[in-house]
Curated annotation (Swiss-Prot):
Job of this protein: Probably part of a binding-protein-dependent transport system PH1214/15/16. Probably responsible for the translocation of the substrate across the membrane.
Pfam families the record matches: BPD_transp_1
Localization in the cell: Cell membrane
Organism: Pyrococcus horikoshii (strain ATCC 700860 / DSM 12428 / JCM 9974 / NBRC 100139 / OT-3)
Bilayer disposition of the protein: Multi-pass membrane protein
Protein name (Swiss-Prot/TrEMBL): Probable ABC transporter permease protein PH1215
Major subcellular site: membrane
Domain of life: Archaea
Residue ranges annotated for the ABC transmembrane type-1 domain, each copy included: 68-284
């Protein structure tokens, strides 16, 4: 194999980026893991190695288990909800509806907004006294549907999940629509000649070929559900009480509000391990797919 004459220049341009990534990503990760095995507490970096003490404390921390439960609830509802709604919207747009470009823009617009803007918008809609939802129910005479929404600890987490699905469905719709449009037209024509209905066309031709788009979107949604800090922080700040705490919020409060850096680092390490469980199989699958 001949070496490209541009290889030295490519390496030269990559070195600064690799140095920055090495310092601010990989070194930071290793340092965080090391700190999680110490007793660093307070602004002064004075600490001693204590082994698994921070992780043992996590096991007996009820807030940690509440946060973990909320993270799992977020994964179980937000991820499939975003995938299914995105697939539904993509199929609708693929049916050659009028003003497709306009509808596509409308569906994608929520994802183009920052999480802070979206959370602020939904906080206004969920406001118990003057929010759009309660005002609308009041005007329609449906007072029994009025609720405290994000101020009700029983449903606050579900309200957050609905808002997140609304924001991310446009992203999954674009992923699926691109996958659908990449299917060769000959497959559609062959199925139509065989007398396939529209439902059979999507069930047996389209959906089975959307594995790659589904996995790509799945990984993105999973990783976001583990670190959805800014959205939830703006919307509820983890409240009422700890009803909408997730691991990222507990990590933030332990690290910056309580200056318990070692404990916050232990929570961050747990988040890292959860993310690796999702990302590593995907990278392996992608690598094997390229080899084939």
């Amino acid at each position: 194999m001949r070496r490209s004459p541009d290889l030295p220049y490519i390496i030269l341009f990559l070195i600064p980026a690799l140095i920055l990534i090495g310092i601010f990503v990989y070194f930071a990760v290793v340092w965080n893991i090391y700190i999680s095995f110490t007793d660093w507490r307070g602004l002064i970096p004075s600490y001693h190695f204590v082994g698994l003490a921070q992780y043992k404390q996590l096991i007996h921390d009820p807030i940690f288990w509440t946060s973990l439960r909320n993270n799992l609830l977020l994964i179980l509802l937000f991820v499939p909800g975003s995938l299914l709604l995105g697939l539904f919207l993509a199929i609708l747009l693929d049916m050659k509806v009028r003003f497709e470009s306009g509808f596509r823009t409308i569906y994608v617009l929520p994802f183009a907004l920052s999480f802070v803007v979206t959370a602020t918008l939904w906080a206004w809609m969920y406001d118990p006294s003057s929010g759009v939802l309660n005002v609308l129910f009041d005007k329609l005479g449906l007072d029994f549907l009025k609720s405290g929404w994000i101020t009700d600890p029983k449903i606050a987490m579900y309200c957050i999940i609905i808002a997140l699905i609304w924001q991310f469905s446009g992203y999954t719709m674009i992923i699926y629509l691109a996958g659908i449009r990449s299917i060769p037209i000959e497959q559609y024509e062959g199925a139509l000649i065989d007398g396939a209905s529209t439902w059979q066309l999507y069930r047996y031709i389209v959906i089975p070929q959307l594995t790659k788009p589904t996995l790509s979107a799945f990984v993105v949604l999973m990783v976001f559900s583990l670190k959805a800090f800014d959205f939830i922080w703006v919307l509820t700040r983890g409240g009422p009480g700890t009803s909408t705490f997730i691991l990222a919020i507990e990590m933030y409060k332990e690290t910056f509000a309580k200056t318990n850096f070692a404990y916050g680092a232990a929570i961050a390490t747990i988040l890292l391990l959860m993310a690796l469980v999702v990302v590593l199989p995907y990278l392996y699958w992608s690598y094997k797919g390229e080899e084939r």
